[in-house]
């Protein structure tokens, strides 16, 4: 079993915390009344986006798909009564490059059902819907690859 160990330190009268990950990276968090950091619930949604994005891009690379840009947009609805858990999340994947739609569908599906632990957790309370858009680009050599004309 993998264990996670993190640390939070109060910074501003208990209204702001700096969290430190086990790898030593810091993130600033604020409560619902402040504006000096991300709210914890926002970080949960960002974690979902990051988790699925890393999965999808890694799977697409293994499939030899050429991705030149990738954005993930997330929207969520929450319960009105505490705990205000997510009840619905929409993830929109926007990729640029030479990517086959079926490869992207497969990568998203694998992330959702097999690899993304954040998706598995949030999916316990929320319906997660995904959409995608591919913005095609002319097939060009990857950085560092020589073209026939330059050989």
Give the residues covered by each predicted segment.
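Extended beta-strand/beta-hairpin segments
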Residues: 1-46, 57-151
């Amino acid at each position: 079993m993998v264990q996670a160990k993190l640390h939070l330190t109060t910074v501003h009268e208990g209204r702001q915390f700096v969290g430190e990950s086990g790898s030593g990276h810091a993130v600033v968090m604020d409560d619902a009344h402040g504006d000096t950091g991300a709210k914890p619930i926002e970080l949960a949604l960002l974690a979902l986006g990051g988790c699925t994005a890393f999965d999808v891009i890694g799977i697409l690379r293994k499939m030899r798909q050429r991705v030149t840009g990738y954005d993930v947009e997330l929207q969520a609805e929450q319960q009105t009564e505490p705990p205000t858990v997510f009840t619905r999340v929409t993830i929109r994947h926007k990729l640029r490059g030479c990517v086959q739609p079926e490869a992207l569908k497969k990568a998203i599906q694998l992330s959702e059902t097999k690899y993304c632990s954040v998706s598995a957790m949030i999916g316990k309370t929320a319906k997660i819907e995904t959409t995608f858009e591919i913005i095609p680009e002319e097939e060009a050599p990857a950085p560092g690859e020589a073209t026939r004309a330059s050989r």
